[in-house]
From Swiss-Prot:
Family: Belongs to the PP2C family.
Name by which UniProt lists this protein: Protein phosphatase 1B
Biased composition (Polar residues): 440-456
Residue positions bearing lipid (N-myristoyl glycine): 2
GO CC term, one of those recorded: cytosol
Reaction(s) this enzyme catalyzes, per UniProt: O-phospho-L-seryl-[protein] + H2O = L-seryl-[protein] + phosphate; O-phospho-L-threonyl-[protein] + H2O = L-threonyl-[protein] + phosphate
PROSITE patterns xrefs: PPM_1, PPM_2
Cofactor binding note of this UniProt entry: Binds 2 magnesium or manganese ions per subunit.
One GO BP: N-terminal protein myristoylation
PTM comment text: Isgylation negatively regulates its activity. N-myristoylation is essential for the recognition of its substrates for dephosphorylation.
The gene coding this protein: PPM1B
Cofactor dependence: Mg(2+); Mn(2+)
C-alpha cells in the first residue's frame, strides 16, 4: 500500500477546554496519508498536587501509530511519577518546585517511557517498528517548560511577535550528526542511515541497539530538550504542531495567521480548523495536528477585523458575479475555474499567512459557492473533482519516486525535482496525464541508474520536496536493513 490516498480524508478531530487561566483548542486531520499517526495530550490540572499546572503535547508518529498513541496517554504519568519529578515536588514545599528538578524529571520521564515501551512484545520482536516525535509544554503558575524530541515544534507568541521556538532535531544538525556518527551511523540525504528523517524520537528501536552506548548516545535519542521561560503578562498564545503544519507555514506566518483568526472568532476549535484546512490547500501531504493554548492576553474579537471580513465577503461576491457575466457568452465556467481566477488576484483584506489561494479556497469558499450556485443553479459538478485530480496526480508522482528509491537511492531527490518540473511543464502544455508520464520517466531513470542533472524551478513550493523527505519514514517495511 502506498503512502498516500487518492483523495484526502478531511474529517477533523476537535477538542477544547479551559482552566488555570488558560483556554485551549485543537484540531487534527489525516489528510493525504494512508493512516492517521498523530496523537495529542491536553490536561488542565496535573494530578499529584499540581492542579494549578497544565500539560499539552503533540505526537507525530511514523511507521505506525503505536508509539504515538501510547505516549499520548501515558507520557505525563511517566514524567510525574518518576523519582526526579517527585523530588521536584518535595523540594519546593509551598513554593513552586525548582526549575532544574522539573527539567530533570521531564527528561527522566522520556527515558523511562522509552525503556518501558521497548518491552512491548510487538516492539521488541520487530512486528511494530513505529516511532514518534513529541513536543509539549508544561505550564506552571510562574514558568513555561517547552519540551521537544524530534521535528514537531512549539512557538510562543508574546507582545505581538514570536518570542520563542523549539529547535527541530534533524540528522544534519552538527550536534545530532556527531552523535549519529559516534554510534557508527551516517547521515545521508539528510536522514539517519539514509532512512529516518528525525534524529530524536520515542520508539524507533531499530536505531537504538548499538552495544556499549547508552540510551542518549544511540543513532536516535529519546532525550528531550527542555527549555524554561518565565511567564509574562504579555504572553498571548502557544502553538504546538507537527511538521505537517510547519512544512508549509513558517513560525511568523502561522502566528500572524492565528492572531488574525482570533480577532474574528473566539472559538479555538474553529481557529485550529482554519489552520489545518489552509495547510492542506498549501500542499501539506502529511497528517496535520495543532494545539492552540491561549493566555488571558490573547487577541480578542475586534470590530475592525469583523468589518474587514464582511468587506471581503462583499468583494468576493461581486467578483464572482463579474467573472460569471464575462464568461456567459462562452458558456458557464466551472467552480474550479472561478477559484483559479480569484486565487491569482490581489484581493484586499485577506488574513496574513495563508497565501492568496489558501485564504480564498478555505475561508471564503462557502461565499463563492453560494454566489456560483445562485448564478448557475443547474451545475452538474462543483469543480472539486478537478482539484482532487490535480492533487491526486501529484500524489501518484511522489509515490512513484518512493518506489524508485529502492533501486536508485543516491539520486532520488534530484530525480524528484526533475519529475516535478516535468509535471508542471506538462500541465502548462496541456498534456492529458502529466503525472503518469512523469512517473514513467521516473521508472526509466531508475532502471538506467544514470545521474540526472538537477533542474531549477522558480515555482517550486517547499512542500513539493518535503513530500518525498517524509513519505518513506513511515512505510514500515525493510529493504537491505534500512527502513523505507
Amino acid at each position: 500500500m502506498g503512502a498516500f490516498l487518492d483523495k484526502p480524508k478531511t474529517e477533523k478531530h476537535n477538542a477544547h477546554g479551559a482552566g488555570n487561566g488558560l483556554r485551549y483548542g485543537l484540531s487534527s486531520m489525516q489528510g493525504w496519508r494512508v493512516e492517521m499517526e498523530d496523537a495529542h495530550t491536553a490536561v488542565v490540572g496535573i494530578p499529584h498536587g499540581l492542579e494549578d499546572w497544565s500539560f499539552f503535547a503533540v505526537y507525530d508518529g511514523h511507521a505506525g501509530s503505536r508509539v504515538a498513541n501510547y505516549c499520548s496517554t501515558h507520557l505525563l504519568e511517566h514524567i510525574t511519577n518518576n523519582e526526579d519529578f517527585r523530588a521536584a515536588g518535595k523540594s519546593g514545599s509551598a513554593l513552586e518546585p525548582s526549575v532544574e528538578n522539573v527539567k530533570n524529571g521531564i527528561r527522566t520521564g522520556f527515558l523511562k517511557i522509552d525503556e518501558y515501551m521497548r518491552n512491548f512484545s510487538d516492539l521488541r520482536n520487530g512486528m511494530d517498528r513505529s516511532g514518534s516525535t513529541a513536543v509539549g509544554v508544561m505550564i506552571s503558575p510562574k514558568h513555561i517548560y517547552f519540551i521537544n524530541c524530534g521535528d514537531s515544534r512549539a512557538v510562543l507568541y508574546r507582545s505581538g511577535q514570536v518570542c520563542f521556538s523549539t529547535q527541530d532535531h534533524k540528522p544534519c544538525n552538527p550536534r545530532e550528526k556527531e552523535r549519529i556518527q559516534n554510534a557508527g551511523g551516517s547521515v545521508m540525504i539528510q536522514r539517519v542511515n539514509g532512512s529516518l528523517a528525525v534524529s530524536r524520537a520515542l520508539g524507533d528501536y531499530d536505531y537504538k541497539c548499538v552495544d556499549g552506548k547508552g540510551p542518549t548516545e544511540q543513532l536516535v535519542s529519546p532525550e528531550p530538550e527542555v527549555y524554561e521561560i518565565l511567564r509574562a503578562e504579555e504572553d498571548e498564545f502557544i502553538i504546538l504542531a507537527c511538521d505537517g503544519i510547519w512544512d508549509v507555514m513558517s513560525n511568523e506566518e502561522l502566528c500572524e495567521f492565528v492572531k488574525s483568526r482570533l480577532e474574528v472568532s473566539d472559538d479555538l476549535e474553529n481557529v485550529c480548523n482554519w489552520v489545518v484546512d489552509t495547510c492542506l490547500h498549501k500542499g501539506s501531504r502529511d497528517n496535520m495536528s495543532i494545539v492552540l493554548v491561549c493566555f488571558s492576553n490573547a487577541p480578542k474579537v475586534s470590530d475592525e477585523a469583523m468589518r474587514k471580513d464582511s468587506e471581503l465577503d462583499k468583494y468576493l461576491e461581486s467578483r464572482v458575479e463579474e467573472i460569471m457575466e464575462k464568461s456567459g457568452e462562452e458558456g458557464m465556467p466551472d467552480l474550479a475555474h472561478v477559484m483559479r481566477i480569484l486565487s491569482a488576484e490581489n484581493i484586499p483584506n485577506l488574513p496574513p499567512g495563508g497565501g492568496l489561494a489558501g485564504n480564498i479556497i478555505f475561508f471564503r469558499r462557502h461565499v463563492i459557492e453560494a454566489v456560483y450556485s445562485r448564478l448557475n443553479p443547474h451545475r452538474e459538478s462543483d469543480g472539486a473533482s478537478d482539484e482532487a485530480e490535480e492533487s491526486g496526480s501529484q500524489g501518484k508522482l511522489v509515490e512513484a519516486l518512493r518506489q524508485m528509491r529502492i533501486n536508485h537511492r543516491g539520486n532520488y531527490r534530484q530525480l524528484l525535482e526533475e519529475m516535478l518540473t516535468s509535471y508542471r511543464l506538462a500541465k502548462v502544455e496541456g498534456e492529458e496525464n502529466p503525472a503518469e508520464q512523469a512517473a514513467t520517466a521516473a521508472s526509466s531513470n531508475s532502471d538506467a541508474g544514470n545521474t540526472v542533472a538537477m533542474q531549477e524551478s522558480h515555482t517550486e513550493s517547499k512542500s513539493d520536496l518535503a513530500e518525498l523527505d517524509s513519505c518513506t519514514e513511515d512505510a514500515g517495511t525493510k529493504m537491505s536493513g534500512e527502513k523505507l
